[in-house]
């Protein structure tokens, strides 16, 4: 795109679409933060806690304790719902970021692609940790942390742009 071509940015959109973008972002931040609170509550965001969540800590644990080994059906359900749901979250936040006037297009492309790659790494690590080696819990914690940081950066940049 040359510098003479018009750019589609939040500033060029009607107020109604800016309001929609603002509220979608706010609700996503609340929802994502709530999900992180749940993860903290169930795993303490540690590799040992994550391992216990998926591999189980006690073979006799009840489902109410949520620290039992996840079955193949549970792993498939968890992966299916979370992967598709999180992809939608990052489509929306990526669209919002694409409409921002800053950062540069190169950085925007990197920030838009990053969560999709990290989602695949996170869910691969979850499966590898569950069925192959518990040490993959470190990769799951690291990739999920990067995913959260990227989400909050997307949200900050979009809300900053919409506050102008």
Located regions from the model:
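A loop-to-helix transmembrane entry motif
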Residues: 70-88
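Extracellular/periplasmic helix-loop-helix junctions in multi-pass membrane proteins
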Residues: 128-140
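Transmembrane alpha-helical segments in integral membrane proteins
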Residues: 83-101
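Polytopic transmembrane helical bundles with strong interfacial aromatic enrichment
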Residues: 2-67, 72-74, 96-99, 110-118, ...
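Membrane-helix interface segments
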Residues: 103-107
């Amino acid at each position: 795109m040359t510098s003479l071509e018009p750019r589609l940015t939040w500033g060029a959109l009607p107020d109604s679409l800016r309001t929609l973008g603002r509220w979608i972002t706010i609700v996503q931040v609340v929802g994502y933060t709530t999900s992180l609170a749940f993860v903290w509550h169930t795993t303490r965001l540690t590799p040992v806690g994550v391992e216990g969540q998926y591999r189980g800590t006690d073979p006799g644990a009840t489902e109410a304790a949520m620290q039992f080994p996840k079955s193949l059906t549970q792993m498939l359900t968890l992966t299916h719902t979370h992967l598709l749901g999180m992809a939608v979250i990052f489509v929306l936040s990526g669209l919002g970021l694409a409409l921002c006037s800053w950062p540069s297009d190169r950085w925007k492309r990197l920030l838009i692609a990053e969560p999709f790659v990290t989602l695949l790494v996170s869910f691969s690590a979850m499966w590898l940790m569950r069925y192959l080696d518990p040490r993959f819990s470190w990769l799951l914690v690291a990739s999920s942390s990067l995913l959260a940081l990227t989400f909050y950066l997307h949200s900050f940049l979009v809300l900053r742009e919409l506050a102008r």
